């Protein structure tokens, strides 16, 4: 599942950084999605970026970033309804992206809501974020770094175990 894939990727990155004696830089998926949205869309005015990852049913993992990718609203799990983000939408345009945004399009109806489809972050989109972290010396401890899960990771054994 996604937890296992994330743990494998983090373990590989930690091993490479340790072996090559290079710093480990973590890039949050939602921040990366916001960055990719900025690179692939062009808005002259001051907008907010709200990347969303589908968390099943009407729940999404989300955060809100400004044009400089500063967090305006922290990462959170959110059940989306018609009043979600109303405070932000009242003041300015908000660009929603990611697979979680697609299911929210019919629920969040506001003239300041912009839904952008088909934003898939690429490794090249990560460069600006990694460079900023490098310049600011924001490195992770290779020995103790753990993936950031919004929900608690619970390891289970499959019910239908086939031998």
Predicted regions located by residue number:
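Short, basic and Ser/Thr-rich N-terminal targeting/leader segments
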Residues: 18, 58, 143-144
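Catalytic-loop motifs flanking and including active-site residues across diverse enzymes
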Residues: 8-12, 81, 122-126
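DPxDG-like acidic metal-binding loop motif
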Residues: 2-29
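Surface "functional belts" at beta-alpha junctions
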Residues: 23-121, 149, 154-155, 159
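A residue-level signal for conserved active-site and pocket-lining positions in enzyme catalytic cores
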Residues: 1, 16, 96, 127, ...
